[in-house]
């Protein structure tokens, strides 16, 4: 059985964050992961269709059906990386599947701690009995490695959503504090999931805030997986497209 890289590239054909133009950079992500998988004897799976209307369940929540999706497509697997399509992987990225110790793995979200803490406080107050989790253990759900022992946990995530769907949809619109990410972090802690943190090099998020995303492409010498999120003044995701295209061409076409 092979290890699987699972990502999503779904045309929501809407406006704003649902606009089709938001998908334009994803081809560079998918191409980079395709080449990394070929080099490391893994298989890439790209989900291109919604399972449920986005009004019923935000697209980010739908990835927690991935075990059912792979099973429905007769795909056998050992371990699975669930990764966002706004990432580029370095061609020489080490095989992180060999680093997991068969645990769930992710990377601490070294982004805006103001946003993270506000999100923790709000979701903790309304969904987790006022509990505040340790923000230093908060991960970005755009990079999570799992295996079949985590199937039940993913079902618990879906069950949590279904039990709280109406309120979750409401707070997603009103708080602007994320969708699945903070609740899933709480659930990882609440369910006692045996977890292993990988270093920042394996999910380099919020690179603009760290002043490492630049035309010299220096960041590609200091890490392995780059996530192009939280880019200021990113109208119609044009800067995401610019940087992902530039990074892909720098790494794969020079």
Q: Where are each of the predicted segments found?
A:
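N-terminal anchoring/stem segment of glycosyltransferases
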Residues: 1-77, 230-232, 247-254
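A structural signal for short, well-ordered beta-strand segments and their strand-loop junctions
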Residues: 5, 44-47, 81-84, 105-107, ...
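Short catalytic/ligand-binding loop motif for oxyanion handling, primarily in non-cytosolic enzymes
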Residues: 14-15, 52-55, 89-92, 97-98, ...
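Short, charged/polar micro-motifs that form catalytic or ligand-binding hotspots
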Residues: 20-23, 57, 134, 140, ...
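Short amphipathic alpha-helical segments and helix-helix/interface helices
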Residues: 30-34, 67, 93-97, 184-185
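GT-A fold catalytic core of metal-dependent nucleotide-sugar glycosyltransferases
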Residues: 59-121, 145-146, 150-151
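Catalytic core and acceptor-binding pocket of nucleotide-sugar-dependent glycosyltransferases
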Residues: 65, 136-239
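Short, flexible, basic/aromatic active-site loop/helix in glycosyltransferases
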Residues: 121-135, 152
